[in-house]
């Protein structure tokens, strides 16, 4: 290492390599040169000023006399700027940073000259062609250099050597002329990167070998990138001379200099060289295992100082392609990591708690809700409302989503590990640095996100009180106070009027009104919750639905006290938007689209996840100054679900589809899941808050204390009749699947096979469902074959008739019955001899034996089954007469009159029998219990309603049904009646999984029955969360009915697999169908 004078520092870089002039020949750094500020009339003075300004940008601060001399000598020349720069570097000294530069040691010239670039004069010539320099930079000279990492590669010899290479000998890396094949298609005419990057002997400059393709791709680009340097050292060649094709191990040390951190360095995103440079930087960081730090992290594992060549799996072989294929799917574990990263970035548990004033908000928030309220107020920049110090956790502001924070690794370069000492200008360099590998920018200062978005996504898990949390925000900030204060003394803005229509083209700003868009089923619940928390504080809510408001714009703009909240539904928004698309200008002057709201809140915001639907487009057209999305599932099917939410909030620049595709969609479709998720996590971190029931606060306490939840899977056995029907449809389904597999067209028969599966599921519930359609299955919509089924009575054969209807003694039995019970009065106070229940009710649930004794239907059937299992004769508990299944009667309401008819058990659903048995037990143990029964088949709910009404009298049990066929008023009445506690009656709510699976608060019930399973376990979890959520005070017990040895049992296994491995988040619809095909194969395996 060469020494300078006493007290001088050793230097590391050559003078010609430290100065990185502009390179117009590269599209990487093209920017538009700007002249001096202000207008100058004298053309000569303007040219001189421009010449000196651009000269300073390349050379830094110089004395005025030197600059004047360069202008006098070269100002009039066409390429004068190039000549002035060349003259300066050939014979002049610069000031400032050059002083430190001249102190650097030049003895290590060869070791630092591992990058073979073109001569400075040639670079300057290319940079100045056509006029002005193309880089703007305050400092051109390297002021410091830091070690970034090391990697080891297996190089392949391309030239023989006369003697072995010495251990530790230095190698040069040379980039030869020519262009590699960037398309990925290797050919003889277009060789790869490894043909253009070679190792050379540092002493003789003789070529020795080539590098692996992936390493060559990195070096080919970065060798000509200012601020990145490499040093190559030979560390293994088996102590023999090299022949062509031999492998030898080379260590690459990578360094970065201050030039890489020059803010003027990055070029334009559309430039090919710029994109290649950024890709090379990404590959370099990946190869060096540079792992980003989470905000607030201090340490990362340091790399070992010594390497074991035999165990180091990071060595890249020149003969093997190193990139590996990514998995073809993403699972729920990755989504959980995504949510976890957003929770960490929000620093939610470090925020102070904000409590709404008790005179304004009637409820007491939980601790995590108070912290969430602070986060929401910060998102809306309502700092004046917050207590001092509330924003300390986010004082510095969130880091820009595209940037990552890294810690400088410990210097384990070859020279340092061998004890070589040197002095470097690193004293003032922070121990962390920041990189945006997508744009190629580097910084030593934390880049702060500068989004102007006011709002965010509250994605708390279902049941944690998102509704109450957002209502607390509305109570705290009901209006735009700053706007109201500034406009109090001003006249309202007058828009331009259309001469033809007389309609203002400027939307008035409703600074005191928040619009909340909800699913129709949740409209009554939101209204009730608003009244409950804001009772008596002066705020009021207006429901905008079914034309109840004649002119919304007048209501919001011209009234002195407009509503604080307007509640409407997605359907209303879509309807009004559709009218606007038909050029109905009156609608734009009256409805939701005629004003700009203060705030818009979307409940169940995932309803707009498909941006191509009318609902999504309509919601996007609404305008406001603050926007919020409430959803427990921001990602449902695809990663692009998030784009619609971001677009709704106008989150720049991510709301632009081209930007989103470049950084999210395209990498995802190319199976680069890690890159796509990395960007998503960074983007969503500042604007998304998610808490789950299992999370704990800063003190280690659970966020919410909920009572226990017990889920019981009850296996149901088919009756003989159901088993016969199931076997018939199963054989048809298996035959269809086997044929499709044999022909290889299973995907083409997708809908037909799903139809077979649907029929099997329907038989498991009730054979009367055959011919109806699953309202949740999008794949079977409008399918013509849905009603193409054989006659059920034909399939049942003799079982379709009552066993006793054709018996010779049945007419006599009916006559004897009518004699014993001549009228309805004789049927009063009937008692079951098995359960000793007096006054069996309703009478339609009574079954009479041949001897004329009455019994509860469920009691008698259980008794017969019990005796059959024992192999004993079934006899009447009263008179000991034989009981035969073919001689049973029941009462049926015919035209308002009860008539005896032969009883048949063949038309009974085993699941319904089990449900009735459980309900009767609940009635006996807790007469006023409230129960929810879930199913995804609306027609099944109809069957259940009829069966339950026949089994339970109205004076002891009330049955309610809630599905998509009810209008808003009917839904409100059903929920109000069900939630009202009765002291003597049991209440049963039959609930459609689609209509009531989300949003509803049914904590009044503590028992639930899920009658049929669904493909996704998440659907059933949502149903359970309607009951097991905040407000529940009792232990929750949930029964899931599964028919054993049926398709339902296999669906249960698929659910278990999804829970353990995760559900697919597919890139497109075709992949979603393929994943369903895999499930189909499992069902018929």
From Swiss-Prot:
GO cellular component: cytoplasm; nucleus
InterPro entries: Helicase_ATP-bd (IPR014001), Helicase_C-like (IPR001650), HIRAN (IPR014905), P-loop_NTPase (IPR027417), SNF2-like_sf (IPR038718), SNF2/RAD54-like_C (IPR049730), SNF2_N (IPR000330), SNF2_RAD54_helicase_TF (IPR050628)
UniProt feature, compositional bias: Polar residues: 106-118
Listed PROSITE patterns: HELICASE_ATP_BIND_1, HELICASE_CTER, ZF_RING_1, ZF_RING_2
Sequence ranges of Basic and acidic residues compositional bias: 92-104
Example of a GO biological process term: DNA repair
Record key words, sorted: ATP-binding, Cytoplasm, DNA damage, DNA repair, DNA-binding, Helicase, Hydrolase, Metal-binding, Nucleotide-binding, Nucleus, Zinc, Zinc-finger
Motif (DEGH box): 603-606
Family stated for the protein in its record: Belongs to the SNF2/RAD54 helicase family.
Name of the featured protein: DNA repair protein RAD5
Organism: Eremothecium gossypii (strain ATCC 10895 / CBS 109.51 / FGSC 9923 / NRRL Y-1056)
């Amino acid at each position: 290492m060469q020494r300078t004078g006493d007290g001088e520092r050793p230097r590391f870089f050559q003078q010609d390599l430290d100065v990185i002039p502009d390179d117009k020949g590269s599209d990487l750094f093209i920017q538009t040169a700007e002249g001096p500020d202000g207008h100058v009339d004298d053309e000569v003075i303007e040219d001189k000023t421009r010449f000196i300004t651009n000269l300073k940008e390349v050379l830094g601060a110089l004395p005025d006399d030197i600059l004047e001399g360069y202008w006098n000598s070269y100002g009039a020349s066409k390429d004068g700027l190039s000549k002035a720069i060349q003259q300066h570097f050939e014979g002049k000294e610069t000031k400032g940073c050059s002083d430190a530069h001249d102190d650097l040691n030049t003895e290590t010239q060869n070791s630092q000259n591992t990058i073979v670039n073109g001569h400075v004069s040639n670079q300057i010539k290319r940079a100045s062609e056509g006029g002005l320099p193309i880089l703007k930079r305050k400092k051109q000279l390297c002021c410091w250099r830091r070690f970034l990492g090391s990697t080891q590669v297996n190089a392949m010899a391309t030239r023989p050597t006369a003697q072995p290479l010495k251990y530790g000998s230095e190698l040069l890396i040379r980039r030869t002329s020519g262009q590699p094949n960037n398309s990925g298609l290797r050919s003889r005419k277009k060789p790869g990167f490894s043909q253009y990057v070679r190792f050379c002997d540092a002493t003789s400059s003789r070529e020795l070998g080539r590098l692996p393709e992936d390493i060559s791709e990195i070096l080919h680009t970065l060798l000509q990138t200012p601020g990145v340097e490499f040093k190559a050292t030979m560390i293994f060649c088996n102590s023999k001379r090299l022949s062509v094709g031999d492998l030898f191990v080379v260590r690459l040390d990578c360094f970065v200099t201050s030039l890489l951190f020059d803010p003027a360095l990055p070029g334009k995103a559309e430039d090919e060289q710029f994109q290649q440079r950024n890709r090379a930087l990404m590959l370099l960081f990946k190869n060096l295992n540079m792992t980003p730090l989470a905000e607030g992290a201090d340490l990362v594992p340091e790399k070992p100082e010594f390497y074991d060549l035999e165990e180091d799996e990071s060595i890249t072989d020149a003969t093997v392609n190193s990139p590996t294929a990514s998995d073809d799917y993403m699972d729920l574990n990755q989504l959980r990591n995504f949510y976890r990263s957003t929770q960490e970035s929000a620093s939610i548990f470090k925020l102070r708690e904000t409590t709404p004033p008790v005179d304004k908000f009637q409820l007491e928030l939980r601790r995590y809700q108070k912290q969430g309220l602070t986060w929401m107020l910060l998102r809306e920049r309502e700092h004046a409302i917050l207590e001092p110090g509330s924003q300390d956790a986010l004082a510095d502001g969130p880091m820009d989503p595209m940037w990552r924070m890294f810690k400088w690794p410990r210097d384990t370069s070859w020279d340092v590990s061998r004890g070589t000492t040197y002095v470097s200008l690193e004293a003032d360099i922070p121990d962390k640095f920041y990189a945006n590998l997508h744009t190629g920018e580097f910084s030593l200062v934390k880049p702060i996100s500068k989004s102007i978005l006011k709002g965010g996504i509250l994605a708390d898990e279902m049941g944690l009180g998102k509704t109450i949390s957002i209502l607390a925000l509305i109570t705290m900030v009901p209006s735009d106070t700053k706007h109201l204060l500034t406009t109090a003394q001003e006249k309202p803005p007058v828009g331009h009027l259309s001469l033809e229509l007389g309609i203002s083209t400027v939307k008035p700003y409703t600074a005191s009104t928040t619009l909340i868009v909800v699913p129709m089923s949740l409209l009554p619940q939101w209204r009730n919750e608003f009244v409950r928390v804001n009772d008596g504080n002066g705020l009021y809510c207006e429901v905008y639905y079914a034309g109840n408001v004649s002119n919304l714009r007048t209501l919001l703009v011209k009234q002195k006290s407009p509503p604080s909240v307007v509640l409407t539904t997605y359907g209303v928004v879509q309807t009004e938007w559709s009218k606007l698309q038909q050029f109905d200008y009156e609608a734009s002057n009256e409805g939701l689209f005629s004003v700009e709201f203060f705030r818009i809140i979307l409940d169940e915001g995932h309803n707009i996840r498909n941006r191509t639907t009318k609902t999504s487009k309509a919601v996007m057209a609404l305008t406001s100054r603050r926007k919020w999305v409430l959803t427990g599932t921001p990602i449902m099917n695809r990663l692009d679900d998030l784009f619609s939410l971001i677009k709704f909030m106008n989150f720049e620049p991510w709301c632009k589809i081209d930007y989103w595709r470049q950084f999210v969609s395209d990498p995802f479709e190319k199976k680069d899941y890690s890159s796509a998720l990395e960007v998503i996590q960074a983007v969503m971190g500042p604007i998304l808050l998610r808490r789950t029931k299992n999370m704990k606060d800063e003190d280690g306490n659970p966020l919410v204390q909920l009572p226990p939840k017990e889920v019981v899977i009850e296996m149901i056995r088919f009756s003989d009749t159901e088993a016969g029907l199931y076997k018939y449809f199963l054989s048809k389904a298996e035959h269809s699947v086997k044929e499709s597999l044999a022909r290889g067209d299973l995907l083409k028969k997708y809908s037909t096979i799903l139809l077979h599966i649907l029929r099997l599921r329907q038989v498991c519930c009730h054979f009367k469902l055959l011919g109806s359609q699953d309202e949740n299955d999008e794949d079977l919509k409008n399918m013509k074959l849905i009603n193409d089924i054989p006659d059920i009575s034909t399939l049942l054969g003799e079982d379709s008739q009552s066993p006793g209807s054709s018996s010779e003694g049945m007419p006599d039995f009916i006559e004897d019955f009518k004699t014993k019970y001549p009228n309805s009065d004789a049927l009063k106070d009937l008692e079951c001899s098995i359960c000793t229940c007096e006054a069996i009710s309703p009478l339609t649930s009574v079954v009479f034996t041949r001897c004329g004794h009455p019994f509860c239907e469920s009691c008698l059937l259980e008794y017969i089954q019990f005796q059959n299992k024992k192999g004993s004769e079934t006899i009447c508990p009263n008179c000991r007469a034989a009981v035969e299944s073919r001689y049973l009667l029941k009462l049926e309401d015919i035209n308002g009159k009860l008539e005896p008819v032969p009883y048949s058990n063949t038309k009974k659903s085993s699941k319904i029998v089990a449900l009735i048995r459980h309900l009767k037990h609940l009635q006996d143990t807790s007469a006023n219990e409230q129960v929810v029964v879930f199913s995804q088949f609306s027609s099944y709910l109809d069957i259940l309603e009829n069966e339950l009404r026949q089994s339970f009298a109205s004076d002891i049990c009330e049955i309610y049904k809630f599905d998509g066929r009810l209008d808003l008023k009917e839904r409100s009445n059903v929920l109000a009646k069900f939630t009202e506690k009765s002291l003597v009656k049991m209440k049963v709510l039959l609930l459609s999984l689609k209509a009531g699976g989300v949003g509803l608060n049914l904590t009044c019930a503590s028992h639930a029955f899920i009658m049929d399973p669904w493909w996704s376990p998440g659907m059933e979890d949502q149903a359970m969360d309607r009951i097991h959520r905040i407000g529940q005070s009792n232990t929750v017990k949930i029964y899931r009915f599964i028919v054993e040895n049926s398709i339902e049992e296999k669906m249960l296994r698929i659910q278990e697999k999804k829970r353990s491995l995760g559900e697919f988040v597919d890139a497109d619809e075709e992949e979603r169908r393929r994943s369903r095909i895999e499930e189909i194969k499992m069902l018929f395996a």
